[in-house]
A protein has these predicted regions:
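Zn2+-dependent metallopeptidase catalytic domains
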Residues: 1-238
């Protein structure tokens, strides 16, 4: 067959996979910053398909052997450093993706990858929902001493939008960050910080309802992810 080269193999492959990466990256970004039930449903419907695609690419022996041929070619050392590094990293990704596994380990590896993707998405959803669930209503503007005028106005408008008096603070970045950076009251900064770092955990402060709070607890997800990663590492010989 024809000798494999950067121009005939790597560039066409990257052009094809880049299209999926870009499109899915946009969808993933939107699911993180503009989450809606509809978008979440579509994302979760397609996540297993995208995960399966990348897992199958990572276990594609023919692609792996093409990269290996590039690496073993006499002119490899003459390639530009960036191209050499790209080839080396591709080979590493293939090995970590289970390309050298045989059945049934190969199928188990794919199942682990898909389960990890689903758990990772659920983890993110729980953090988003826990972030949405928290609010702190401050009645006395003196407690917000140090906050810039625009942050104060936004907090006031946020409270009014809910039909409430005073100022509403949340764990969303436009509300949370000005408090952490500018608020003079240590107690206010601490209360918001504790709420932020314990989101979706067994020590979470929101939602107020214990059942709803427990439903967003990521502890069990973390435990399962750690176990899956340990099994994945074992399958790869680590």
């Amino acid at each position: 067959g024809a000798t494999v080269s950067w121009e005939t193999f790597v560039e066409p492959l990257e052009d094809v996979t880049e299209q999926l990466s870009r499109a899915w990256g946009i969808v993933g970004h939107l699911s993180g910053v503009a989450d809606t039930p509809e978008l979440r449903a579509v994302y979760n419907e397609n996540l297993p398909l995208v995960t399966q695609f990348w897992t199958e690419v990572g276990q594609n022996r023919a692609l792996y052997e093409q990269y290996q041929a590039l690496h073993d070619a006499p002119d490899f050392d003459a390639l530009p450093p960036a191209r050499r590094r790209t080839i080396e990293l591709a080979l590493q990704r293939f090995k970590l993706g289970g390309v050298e596994l045989q059945s049934p380990a190969r199928e188990r590896f794919m199942a682990i990858s898909e389960r990890q993707a689903a758990l990772g998405q659920k983890f993110s959803e729980n953090v988003l929902d826990a972030t949405d669930a928290f609010e702190l209503i401050v009645a006395d503007p003196a407690e917000l001493d140090g906050l810039p005028a625009d942050a104060l106005a936004a907090a006031r408008q946020s409270a009014q939008a809910d039909g409430k008096e005073g100022y509403k603070l949340t764990l969303h970045f436009p509300s949370y960050f000005p408090v952490m950076q500018y608020a003079n009251r240590r107690e206010l900064r601490e209360s918001l910080y504790r709420a932020y770092v314990t989101r979706a955990s067994e020590n979470a402060l929101a939602p107020a309802d214990p059942v709803a709070r427990e439903a967003l607890d990521n502890t069990a997800i973390i435990d399962e992810l750690m176990a899956l990663r340990q099994e994945e590492a074992s399958l790869l010989g680590y």
